[in-house]
């Protein structure tokens, strides 16, 4: 790997979740591409190799996204603490994430972890869906 690409990679590793999201939007605009389109293709590919067709119905989803849909205004600080703890975001980034609900808190996590995080956020006063 060249020194330039290593430097870029290290810079990307230090981005917060919100900064990474902003970067994706800027890249999409600058190059006229869509990150969502390629993700849809990747998600469709496993079903394409399903074989006889009814194998897909028996498959259970293994990765989930935890989405904060809304929260009780009186419980905002509690929800913020849970989200901050779960994501490792700084206070400002976690606050921005919570205030911009509905927003994905964590992506591609195991079912047990997703259900545990959902329970924590709901106990703190948030409304959560798993996708």
From Swiss-Prot:
GO terms for molecular function: mRNA binding; structural constituent of ribosome. Signal peptide: none annotated. InterPro entries: Ribosomal_bL12, Ribosomal_bL12_C, Ribosomal_bL12_C/ClpS-like, Ribosomal_bL12_oligo, Ribosomal_bL12_oligo_N_sf. Keywords: Ribonucleoprotein, Ribosomal protein. GO terms for cellular component: cytosolic large ribosomal subunit. One of its GO terms (biological process) is translation. It comes from the Bacteria. Pfam families: Ribosomal_L12, Ribosomal_L12_N. Belongs to the bacterial ribosomal protein bL12 family. Homodimer. Part of the ribosomal stalk of the 50S ribosomal subunit. Forms a multimeric L10(L12)X complex, where L10 forms an elongated spine to which 2 to 4 L12 dimers bind in a sequential fashion. Binds GTP-bound translation factors. Forms part of the ribosomal stalk which helps the ribosome interact with GTP-bound translation factors. Is thus essential for accurate translation. This is Large ribosomal subunit protein bL12. The gene is rplL.
């Amino acid at each position: 790997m060249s020194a330039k690409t290593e430097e870029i990679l290290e810079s990307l590793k230090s981005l917060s979740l919100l900064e990474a999201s902003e970067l994706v939007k800027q890249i999409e605009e600058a190059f006229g591409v869509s990150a969502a389109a390629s993700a849809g293709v990747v998600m469709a590919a496993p079903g394409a190799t399903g074989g006889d067709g009814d194998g897909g119905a028996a498959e259970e989803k293994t990765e989930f996204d935890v989405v904060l849909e809304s929260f009780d205004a009186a419980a905002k600080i509690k929800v913020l603490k849970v989200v901050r703890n779960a994501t490792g975001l700084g206070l400002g980034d976690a606050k921005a994430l919570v205030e911009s609900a509905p927003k994905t808190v964590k992506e591609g996590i195991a079912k047990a972890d997703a259900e545990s995080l959902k329970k924590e956020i709901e106990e703190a006063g948030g409304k959560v869906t798993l996708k």
